[in-house]
Design a protein with these regions (language model features):
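An N-terminal boundary/leader segment
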Residues: 1-55, 65, 290-292, 467-471
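Glycine-rich, small-residue loops and helix-cap segments
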Residues: 20, 31, 75, 115, ...
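Acyltransferase
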Residues: 21-29, 58, 246-250, 275-299, ...
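Residue-level signal for inorganic ion chemistry
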Residues: 31, 53, 222, 262, ...
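Acidic/His- and Gly-rich active-site-bordering loop/insert found
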Residues: 55, 63-138
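Short helix-loop capping/hinge segments that flank enzyme active sites or metal/cofactor-binding pockets
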Residues: 73-93, 253-265, 314-366, 379-382, ...
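Short glycine/serine-rich loop segments
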Residues: 103-233, 417-438
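A short helix-breaking turn/cap at a secondary-structure junction
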Residues: 191-283, 462-471
Length: 471
């Protein structure tokens, strides 16, 4: 029974709780046993709050017995990325300098989830301040995809995605500024939602690209977490009121994809795509057609992702690197590399990226989606790859020499973030080596419910999410 419990979805757990067929105490114990078994293989956790989780589970059990009307996520165990502040629980930001930091207040999203009665299992790994597309740091080491320990889980929400797919909680809380939810969801075989700009608030939001969001094994579970955390907050100048549409109802849209118009793009003009990813994406398009969708391949003209990233974010990396060095903290090599490149970026280039670049990207997506309900792409140009180091990732993809894969991996997910658009990664198959590949569904600004509806119907039609790694 315990093995069955840790694979249950959040939706299923809620139904079992209310039918008095299982208790939060049983579920939390099963998930903690699973965590103890798999974490040495994937290294997804920074902090485990086992005692606290057991206490919360007992309290939840008592409230469920009382028969009171409780939120849908009540009693569901979950993890939180270690960039989100958790009052009274260590929050390291993936940085050795904050190894013992314990915040006094909760991040907005986590505070809203606590109000729903979720149970905290612990904090998941992230690179230093979430600044990389892989989850590796001096503090925690490297996090692996559950499908092949030793291969990267992606980043920066790598621990969150790896935990969910390994059976450590049905849902997780992550964040995404350029793919940090969607990339690890792709490399680990999870569902990850990057909401439209302003949907989920974060305090002191400075650019609108970054947002918190859910990771889960099903679109429905991710929609449940999204719905519980969305809505305006005065601490975020980009935040918007709650959607008039229910994300949960969108995920429960009945039927197949009949009538859905899909625009499809293989590489978003970035011209680098692993042959296995190309093959699986072609098959996914055929699956959509078989499910009733109309699919039309489109082109899109976007700036070079790596170059635009340097212009938009390079100064932040340079400033961070200088602060860490001044404090005697050794930098992870890829962060140092981006900081070094940033030294050659001019003020004019930074200004152009902010003033014109984002609008040009937004307009390019709008043109590509003319006459379509959603745009679909591969989530990542390559599947999971070996951890950096002596046996690091190849710099050849389909015969092309490319930048380090830990930087290239966000080339398909950065542009929708700069445009502020909703995007979701769902499992889209497995390559010849058994590694998962994600599909990215992108929608129009604030059309989050439409994206969720299409992604949920695709997921039900294919069933890739029903496979579990053999850990």
């Amino acid at each position: 029974m315990s093995e069955e419990l840790f694979w249950k979805s959040a939706r299923e757990l809620g139904e079992l709780y209310r039918a008095r067929q299982v208790s939060p105490v049983e579920v939390v114990e099963a998930v903690l046993e699973r965590l103890e078994s798999v974490n040495p293989k994937i290294n997804a956790m920074v902090t485990v709050t086992a005692d606290q989780a057991r206490e919360q589970a007992k309290a939840a059990e008592e409230r469920l017995r009382s028969g009171e009307d409780l939120p849908p996520l009540f009693g569901v165990p979950m993890t939180v990325k270690d960039l989100a502040e958790t009052a009274g629980v260590r929050t390291t930001y993936g940085c050795a300098a904050f190894a013992d930091y314990v915040p006094e207040e909760d991040a907005i999203g986590w505070a809203r989830l606590k109000e729903q009665g979720v149970i905290l299992l612990g904090k998941t790994t992230t690179p230093e301040f979430g600044l990389l597309g892989v989850t590796e740091s001096k503090l925690t080491g490297s996090t692996s995809t559950p499908w092949r320990p030793g291969y990267n889980a992606g980043g920066s929400s790598g621990g969150a995605a790896a935990a969910v797919v390994a059976g450590v909680g049905p849902v997780a809380w992550g964040s995404d500024g350029g793919g940090s939810i969607r990339v690890p969801s792709s490399l680990c075989g999870a569902v990850g939602i990057k909401p439209s700009i302003g949907r989920i608030p974060t305090a002191d939001n400075t650019d609108g690209d970054s947002t918190d969001g859910p990771i889960a094994r099903t679109v429905l579970d991710a929609a449940m977490v999204f719905e519980a955390t969305a809505g305006h907050h005065p601490s975020d100048r980009f935040s918007v009121p709650r959607d008039t549409r229910s994300y949960v109802e969108a995920a429960l849209t009945p039927g197949d994809l009949t009538g859905v118009r899909v625009a499809a793009c293989y590489d978003l003009g970035q011209k680098v795509l692993d042959p296995d990813v190309r093959r699986l994406f072609t098959q996914a398009l055929d699956d959509m057609r078989a499910a009733g969708a109309t699919v039309e391949e489109v082109g899109i003209e976007l700036p070079d992702t790596m170059l635009f990233f340097d212009h938009l974010n390079g100064y932040e990396y340079l400033e961070f690197a200088e602060e860490m060095r001044a404090g005697g903290v050794e930098l992870w090599p890829m962060i140092a590399e981006v900081a070094e490149r940033a030294k050659s970026v001019t003020g004019r280039q930074v200004s152009a990226a902010f003033r014109r670049g984002k609008t040009e990207i937004y307009n390019a997506f709008a043109a590509a989606m003319t006459g379509a309900d959603v745009l679909v792409t591969p989530t990542t140009p390559v599947p999971a790859f070996p951890h950096d180091g002596a046996a690091g990732p190849t710099r050849l993809v389909d015969g092309q020499e490319v930048p380090p894969l830990g930087l290239l991996i966000h080339s398909m997910t950065e542009p929708p973030s700069h445009a502020g658009l909703p995007a979701i990664s769902v499992p889209g198959g497995f390559d010849a080596d058994g590694l998962p590949i994600g599909l990215q569904f992108i929608g129009r600004l604030w059309a989050d419910a439409d994206v969720i509806s299409v992604a949920a119907r695709y997921q039900r039609a294919t069933g890739w999410h029903t496979r579990h790694p053999a850990l």
